Amino acid sequence: MADPKFQNLPGIAYDQPDVYETPDDPETDTSDYYEEEPENEAIERMHISASAAHKRFSGATLEGSVDFTDRIGRRPGRGYDMRGAGEYELVGQGEKETPVQKCQRLQIEMNELLNEVAALQVDRKIADEEKQSYDAVATVISTAKKVLDTLKLEQVLGKEQVPNSKQVKALISQVEEFKQSGVLTAIPTPGTDLASTARVASLEQRLYQLEKTVGAQPEKLSRLNAATNTTNVLEAVRQLSTKAALLQPDKLDTIEQRLTTLAGKMDSIAEKSSGSSQDAKRDQKISELYDIAKRTEPVVEILPHVIERMQALESLHKYANNFAKIIAEIEHKQGTITTSLVNNKELLHSVQETFAQNLETITNKVAKVEQRVTAISTAK
């Protein structure tokens, strides 16, 4: 019933219950069809794997100095500290490597390659030429590894970019030891082929053997060339051997007989000669032919050998021509790399200046913000 104090008031219903219940609505038929929203490129959908995340942070440790906040400061906050005893972690697919990670990965790969080359050098089944090529490859890898050890990442990137880990400290100690030793190594070009390097090493070894056999004194070689009228050492040796063969005792008698016969013929020709102009011209032509025959006599004997030698050296000349082209191409690439390094250095300098200016501007703005926050907190 209604409360007695509400009696005799307009708008009050009497003889009716105080609680009213609305009837239940009939259940509407609902479908299980779910309309998928169209994909939006502005919304990033990240797919995180729990197992991959567990493996990624399985060796992480926390210390008292960690900071996961996003506060603005000169140095970024420290989060998880990945510590490992000489083990390097490779980045995932699609992730960008840091310079330190690249340096560590290259060191590991070079050590593995050196071990493989050393194992191949010890193998007895490999021929000597292949072992020499492996020696040249090992030399190139050792030089590249030394150059990699000389990189000063802390001076180039700054102390904030290079973490203070055991690997980086060991790398810095190796750089200091190499600096104190005073040994300078040439930086190999990135586009150098290992096969061409092996061929260059083989050619250098053959050149050393040739100098050891013939001699590397230019004075003696110039005198030999002047005496034999040729710049080819093999041809000069063949001429000397031919002349020495003519001076043998069994051939001196034959030469003497031929000279005696020739002298008799010359005497008979001189007796039959007359003072006419036709005879004089004929004698002049005969003397010229005789001089030509005398000049070409030693060449006629060695000419077949010279032709055979030239045919044998044809492949070597082609190989030398190809080698000269390769050297010219390497020099061109080296010049291109040098130019790109200069441009990159200038670009790095400009980026550093811009970064320093931006950092100074940000520092000033942060200081102003902190002053304003301090003033507001003081005013409250």
Curated annotation (Swiss-Prot):
Keywords: Coiled coil, Cytoplasm, Cytoskeleton, Dynein, Membrane, Microtubule. InterPro entries: Dynamitin. The keyword Transcription regulation does not apply. It is found in: Cytoplasm, Cytoskeleton; Membrane. Pfam families: Dynamitin. It is a peripheral membrane protein. It comes from the Eukaryota. One of its GO terms (biological process) is mitotic spindle organization. Residues 21-40 have a biased composition (Acidic residues). Residues 100-135, 353-377 form a coiled coil. Belongs to the dynactin subunit 2 family. Modulates cytoplasmic dynein binding to an organelle, and plays a role in prometaphase chromosome alignment and spindle organization during mitosis. May play a role in synapse formation during brain development. Subunit of dynactin, a multiprotein complex associated with dynein. This is Dynactin subunit 2.
